[in-house]
């Protein structure tokens, strides 16, 4: 099963995250299938590759709770519903 989850980058007190599609059985710092976006909690900025996120979700990828919240803030799910 593929999951959309956060992968931490940056140093102490300056953490940034990449939203990645990754096999659910691999560890957190494991090799990602593909990077689909990024999230900076300090600046509260989200960047996402919408077509790639939709591609993975349509094929059964499950976002983690945190990623789901981030994508809802970025209104990705609203765009996904409008598409179908």
Curated annotation (Swiss-Prot):
The terms describing its cellular component in GO are: chloroplast; mitochondrion; small ribosomal subunit
Q: Which domain of life is it from?
A: Eukaryota
> Where in the cell does this protein reside?
Plastid, Chloroplast
Q: Which UniProt keywords apply?
A: Chloroplast, Plastid, Ribonucleoprotein, Ribosomal protein
Q: Which GO terms describe its biological process?
A: mitochondrial translation
Q: Which InterPro entries does the record associate with it? A: Ribosomal_bS16, Ribosomal_bS16_dom_sf
The protein's predominant localisation is plastid
Q: Which Gene3D superfamilies match?
A: 3.30.1320.10
Q: Which GO terms describe its molecular function?
A: structural constituent of ribosome
Similarity field: Belongs to the bacterial ribosomal protein bS16 family.
Instruction: Kindly provide the name given to this protein in its UniProt entry.
Output: Small ribosomal subunit protein bS16c
Its source organism is Huperzia lucidula
Q: Which gene encodes it?
A: rps16
């Amino acid at each position: 099963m593929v999951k959309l989850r956060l992968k931490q980058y940056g140093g102490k007190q300056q953490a940034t995250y990449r939203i990645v599609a990754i096999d659910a059985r691999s560890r957190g710092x494991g090799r990602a299938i593909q990077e689909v976006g990024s999230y900076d909690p300090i600046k509260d900025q989200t960047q996402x590759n919408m077509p790639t996120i939709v591609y993975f979700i349509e094929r059964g990828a499950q976002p983690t709770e945190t990623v789901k919240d981030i994508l809802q803030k970025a209104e990705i799910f609203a765009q996904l519903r409008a598409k179908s």
